[in-house]
Amino acid sequence: MDSRLNPFQDKMEKTLNNLEEEYAGIRAGRANPHILDKLRVDYYGTPSPIQSVANVSVPEPRMIQIQPWEASMVKEIEKAINCSDIGINPTNDGKLIRLVFPELTEERRKDLAKDIKKKGEEAKVAVRNIRRDAIDSIKKTGKEEGISEDEIKGLEDDAQKLTDKFVAKVDAAVDAKCKEILTV
C-alpha cells in the first residue's frame, strides 16, 4: 500500500472505531458497563466520568453495581443516570447504586437491530466519502507532481481496495452486533 494513502486509512480506522464504540453502548439484554461511558457527574465542580469517582462492576448478568468512593457522590451519580437517556432507573440504598436491566422484548430487539444497521450504513457512507477524498487528493497531487496516469490509476485502485476492506469490516461489526441483539 502506498504511503500516500496512510492518512485516509487512519480516517477509515477512526470511523470503524467510532462505530464499535457506539455499538459498545447498545445494551443487548445484558449489563454492559460501557453504557455509562458518556455519563458525567459533577465532582467538586468538574464534570467527571462515573468510572473515575466510583467502582463499576457487573455482579450479575443483568445488573450493574456502582459503588462511589465518596458517600456524597451517590446522589450525584443517581441524578446523572436519571437525566441520561439509557432508559434504566437506578435503585439507591445509600451506599450502592444498582441498575437492573430488564429482558428485551422481541419488538425492542428488532428496533435495536434497525438502529445498528442504520449506524453501520452511516459508517459505510463515511468510509466511501473518505475514499472520494483520497481519489480527489490523488488526482490533484498527481497533476501537480507530474505522476503518470497509470500510477494514478493504481493509487485509485488501492484506495478502492482499502475501502472494500473497511466496508467488509463494518459489515462484520453490524452482523456481529445484530446477532448479539437478536439472540434471546
Curated annotation (Swiss-Prot):
Gene3D superfamilies: 3.30.1360.40, Ribosome-recycling factor (1.10.132.20). GO terms for biological process: translational termination. One of its GO terms (molecular function) is ribosomal large subunit binding. Pfam families: RRF (PF01765). Keywords: Cytoplasm, Protein biosynthesis. GO terms for cellular component: cytoplasm. InterPro entries: Ribosome_recyc_fac (IPR002661), Ribosome_recyc_fac_dom (IPR023584), RRF_sf (IPR036191). It is found in: Cytoplasm. Signal peptide: none annotated. CDD domains: RRF (cd00520). Responsible for the release of ribosomes from messenger RNA at the termination of protein biosynthesis. May increase the efficiency of translation by recycling ribosomes from one round of translation to another. Belongs to the RRF family. This is Ribosome-recycling factor. The lineage of its organism: Bacteria, Bacillati, Bacillota, Clostridia, Lachnospirales.
